[in-house]
């Protein structure tokens, strides 16, 4: 999948588009096709290296930890969500963030987007 990643810490110039492989979906996770994400202070602080002692991840790192989209796949133990559900989420803070075409989210971190809100 395509994602915006960093391969080193630095200014906005270190952001680059790359092909990335996500880890496998676990039994309590869903795959979300992204329609929107956001830029928050944690994103630029991590990109510039201010949080590297707290999050000791290997590169590449996909930034972003907010998403709105549609579920395209569910793990084997997911019971409250199904393919096609429109959702908001604040995924776990991992090196696989939301500046990407799709993202993996634990099922307990999802919220349903009301039908009155379009994507």
Give residue ranges: language-model regions.
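Extreme N-terminal starter segment of soluble prokaryotic enzymes
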Residues: 1-2
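Short beta-strand-to-turn element immediately C-terminal to the catalytic PLP-Schiff-base lysine
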Residues: 6, 47, 72-73, 104-105
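Short N-terminal binding/cap micro-motifs at the start of the first secondary-structure element
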Residues: 10-15, 41, 79
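Short gly/ser/thr-rich secondary-structure transition/capping motifs
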Residues: 11-17, 50-53
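Conserved hydrophobic/aromatic beta-strand scaffold that supports enzyme active sites
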Residues: 17-22, 68-70, 102-104, 110
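Glycine-rich beta-strand-centered segment in the early N-terminal region that forms part
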Residues: 21-38, 51-94
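Cytochrome P450 core scaffold surrounding the K-helix E-X-X-R motif
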Residues: 42-48
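NAD(P)H dinucleotide-binding glycine-rich loop of Rossmann-like/cofactor-binding domains
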Residues: 80, 90-119
């Amino acid at each position: 999948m395509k994602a915006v990643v960093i391969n080193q810490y630095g200014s906005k110039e270190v952001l680059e588009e790359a092909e990335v492989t996500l880890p496998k979906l676990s039994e309590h996770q869903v795959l979300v096709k992204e329609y929107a994400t956001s830029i928050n202070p944690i994103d630029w602080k991590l990109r510039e290296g201010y949080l590297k002692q707290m999050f000791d991840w290997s590169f590449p790192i996909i930034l972003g930890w907010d998403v709105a989209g549609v579920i395209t796949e569910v793990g084997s133990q997911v019971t409250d969500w199904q393919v096609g559900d429109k959702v908001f989420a604040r995924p776990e803070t991992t090196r696989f963030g939301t500046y990407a075409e799709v993202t993996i989210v634990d099922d307990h971190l999802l919220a349903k987007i009301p039908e009155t809100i379009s994507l």
